[in-house]
């Protein structure tokens, strides 16, 4: 969801999960645990990734995933929504029964940090002690700030942030990130790195809402990097979005299937280049994929389902090994697809995590992933690789 899905949250006390400071300090210089039966895991594929040193997060993640059942691996690939005003207990059975690994706080959480902290702590209580939840939210600033009230600063819009120096913005982002961390949020689905190329008012998802930094691609990259680094200073992960940019479409993918064909963006162009620079310089926790279609890149698939963009460019060209997450799978832009195949198509393209903005989408997406993986060994290998990337992120963040 272009305006909703910027989501991931973790339990309040940062020290409680033993954050891996080395990863969070990277600069631009470049017990409810279950013991699965052997018969459930021995035949499952290993992650198809290079063999890392045994103490590196990737190696630890491989070991963790090798001990998981298929259903547990699939659960790591799903982010479920908790809406403002909803009781966290409404997700208890979903998290435990489906082995869900991530949650997102959606809506107008306007009663302050204590309310959020209580909710995130309750959510974490449903997860195994050795595999805590990623908990995210959209906290961009301006019109897209889901958490407000005592304990959360009123954040300026991204356009206003674009008038700040990079150093000042990094410092401010560190403050905002510290507020998120104290409330139990560990991933901020920000910053938006799209570059608006035409009339701002006619660009419904970004320009009309002042969600970009209001600069050229180079300036947007510089300010996006500052936000990523500021959040990392606060031990909060960032999700750059919406790759490769929504600045050249007129329609908002959350609400329409019209006006979401980008006819100008290319992988070698400045707009996608802003993302590429931020990704290669900061190695963000996540890259969120756009739901628009890019005529000059892959005219047959939205970016979220494009192996050309994810496997071909983000994975192979940029060498990004982090988590690739969808924008909201329940957005109108994807309404023509079979819900049970949404997560499948993301993983087939090289992606990892389905961000879900509507509760009734969760079960069919989970079931679709499980059914395909059980019948298709090649797809099961992709599930294993995706779960390994998610677990590597959790290990870096001290969640597993």
Regions found by a protein language model. Name each.
Residues 1-27, 31-134, 142-145:
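N-terminal hydrophobic targeting/anchoring segments and the immediately downstream early-domain regions
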Residues 47-52, 80-85, 105-111, 157-171, ...:
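Second-shell loop/turn segments in exported
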Residues 75-82, 101-105, 133-139, 187-191, ...:
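Hydrophobic faces of well-ordered beta-strands that scaffold small-molecule active sites
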Residues 83-87, 108-112, 139-144, 187, ...:
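Solvent-exposed loop/turn segments at secondary-structure junctions
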Residues 126-152, 172-198, 220-244:
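Glycine-rich, aromatic-flanked loop segments that form ligand/cofactor-binding clefts
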Residues 377-400:
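Mid-to-C-terminal alpha-helical segments outside catalytic/metal-binding sites
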């Amino acid at each position: 969801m272009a305006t909703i899905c910027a989501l991931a949250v973790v339990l309040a006390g940062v020290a409680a999960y033993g954050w891996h400071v080395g990863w969070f300090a990277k600069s631009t210089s470049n017990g409810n645990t279950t013991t699965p039966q052997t018969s459930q895991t021995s035949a499952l594929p290993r992650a198809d990734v290079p063999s890392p040193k045994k103490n590196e997060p990737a190696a630890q993640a491989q070991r963790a995933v090798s001990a998981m059942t298929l259903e547990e691996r699939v659960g790591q690939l799903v982010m479920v929504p908790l809406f403002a005003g909803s009781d966290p207990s409404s997700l208890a059975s979903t998290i435990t029964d489906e082995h869900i690994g991530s949650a997102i706080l959606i809506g107008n959480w306007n009663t302050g940090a204590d309310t959020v902290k209580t909710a995130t702590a309750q959510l974490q209580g449903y997860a195994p002690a050795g595999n805590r939840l990623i908990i995210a939210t959209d906290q961009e600033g301006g019109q897209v700030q889901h958490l407000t009230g005592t304990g959360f600063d009123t954040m300026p819009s991204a356009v206003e942030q674009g008038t700040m120096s990079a150093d000042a913005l990094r410092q401010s982002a560190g403050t905002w990130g510290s507020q998120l961390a104290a409330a139990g949020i560990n991933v901020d689905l920000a910053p938006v790195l799209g570059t608006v190329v035409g009339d701002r008012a006619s660009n419904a998802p970004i320009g009309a809402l002042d969600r970009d930094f209001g600069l050229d691609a180079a300036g947007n990259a510089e300010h996006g990097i500052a936000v990523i680094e500021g959040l990392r200073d606060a031990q909060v992960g960032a999700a750059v979005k919406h790759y490769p940019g929504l600045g050249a479409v007129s329609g908002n993918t959350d609400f329409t299937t019209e006006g979401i064909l980008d006819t100008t963006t290319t992988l070698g162009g400045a707009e996608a280049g802003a993302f590429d620079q931020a990704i290669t310089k900061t190695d963000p926790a996540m890259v969120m994929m756009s739901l628009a279609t890019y005529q000059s890149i892959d005219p047959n698939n939205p970016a979220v389902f494009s192996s050309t963009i994810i496997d071909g460019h983000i994975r192979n060209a940029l060498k990004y090994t982090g988590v690739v997450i969808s924008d909201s799978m329940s957005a109108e832009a994807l309404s023509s697809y079979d819900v049970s195949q949404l997560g499948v198509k993301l993983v087939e393209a090289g992606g990892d995590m389905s961000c879900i903005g509507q509760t009734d989408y969760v079960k069919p997406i989970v079931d679709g992933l499980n059914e395909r993986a059980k019948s298709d060994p090649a797809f099961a290998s992709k599930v294993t690789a995706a779960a390994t990337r998610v677990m590597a992120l959790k290990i870096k963040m001290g969640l597993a």
